[in-house]
């Protein structure tokens, strides 16, 4: 079944209809040589095993063989999760450890996703764009090319409450640290949002905005460009 991930109601339907998953990894010190492990992925022999699969299946194996198990340890990082994480192996970008990126996200070439960044379903990250540490791109958020989304900044999602219009950040824009772009707001190409700002309405191209709510304080000039320069070396 296909879903239109540009529509918040379709995303909600996708989440509702998806098979919920509670994957676990279990380390077992014991004899599982005769255990039935058809529904799980497993490795090991001679008294030590690693099992990976759904919680219900692995719990059954452990309980059925508890008299043969000396010790076991369970690792689990989600419960009834509706959306898996994005498969990063085919992404032509730099993604640092600790970034949380859900499936159905598009990441452009030479983008940089830093530690602690969170990118939700339906988001689009353009070529050469950096999502800095602990920044959040909500559902369907769209970042253009060579954008810098500063540390701790938030591009609000439009899944709940549902909105037809996603946040859109234009090419070469810079969003300062800890700033917030509210639902449906569009930031023009080349514009700069000062750190800590709360942007509640659309911003035109090539201006600087600051404050809460953010207001235009000047046009982007050479001094602004020097202070907000994008470094290509960070995107190699």
Swiss-Prot record:
Catalytic reactions on record: (S)-2,3,4,5-tetrahydrodipicolinate + acetyl-CoA + H2O = L-2-acetamido-6-oxoheptanedioate + CoA
CDD domains: LbH_THP_succinylT
Enzyme Commission code(s) on record: 2.3.1.89
Biological processes per GO annotation: diaminopimelate biosynthetic process; lysine biosynthetic process via diaminopimelate
InterPro entries the record matches: DapH, DapH_N, Hexapep, Hexapep_transf_CS, Trans_hexapeptide_repeat, Trimer_LpxA-like_sf
Record-level Gene Ontology MF annotations: tetrahydrodipicolinate N-acetyltransferase activity
Pathway: Amino-acid biosynthesis; L-lysine biosynthesis via DAP pathway; LL-2,6-diaminopimelate from (S)-tetrahydrodipicolinate (acetylase route): step 1/3
Keywords, ordered alphabetically: Acyltransferase, Amino-acid biosynthesis, Diaminopimelate biosynthesis, Lysine biosynthesis, Repeat, Transferase
Top-level taxon of origin: Bacteria
Enzyme kind, highest EC tier: transferase
Keyword Repeat attached: yes
Residues annotated as signal peptide: none
Keyword Iron-sulfur annotated: no
NCBIfam families (alphabetical): DapD_Ac
Function, in words: Catalyzes the transfer of an acetyl group from acetyl-CoA to tetrahydrodipicolinate.
Entry similarity comment: Belongs to the transferase hexapeptide repeat family. DapH subfamily.
Protein name per Swiss-Prot or TrEMBL: 2,3,4,5-tetrahydropyridine-2,6-dicarboxylate N-acetyltransferase
């Amino acid at each position: 079944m296909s879903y239109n991930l540009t529509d918040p109601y379709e995303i909600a339907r996708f989440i509702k209809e998806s098979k919920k998953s509670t994957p676990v990894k279990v380390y077992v010190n014991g004899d599982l040589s005769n255990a039935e492990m058809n529904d799980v992925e497993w490795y090991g022999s001679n008294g030590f095993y690693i099992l990976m699969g759904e919680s219900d299946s692995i719990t059954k194996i452990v309980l059925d063989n508890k008299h043969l198990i000396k010790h076991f340890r369970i690792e689990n990082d989600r419960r009834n999760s509706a959306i898996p994480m994005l498969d990063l192996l085919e992404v032509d970008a730099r993604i640092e450890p600790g970034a949380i990126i859900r499936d159905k996200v598009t990441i452009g070439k030479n983008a940089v996703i830093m530690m602690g960044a969170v990118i939700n379903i339906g988001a689009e990250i353009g070529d050469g764009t950096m999502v800095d540490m602990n920044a959040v791109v909500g559902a369907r958020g769209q970042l253009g090319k060579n954008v810098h989304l500063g540390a701790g900044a938030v591009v609000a999602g439009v899944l709940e409450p549902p909105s037809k219009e996603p946040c859109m950040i234009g090419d070469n824009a810079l969003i300062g640290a800890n700033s917030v772009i509210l639902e449906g707001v569009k930031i023009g190409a080349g514009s700069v949002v000062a750190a800590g700002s709360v942007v509640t309405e659309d911003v035109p191209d090539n201006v600087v905005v600051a404050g809460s709510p953010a207001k235009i304080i000047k046009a982007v000039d050479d001094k602004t460009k020097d202070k907000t320069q994008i470094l290509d070396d960070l995107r190699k």
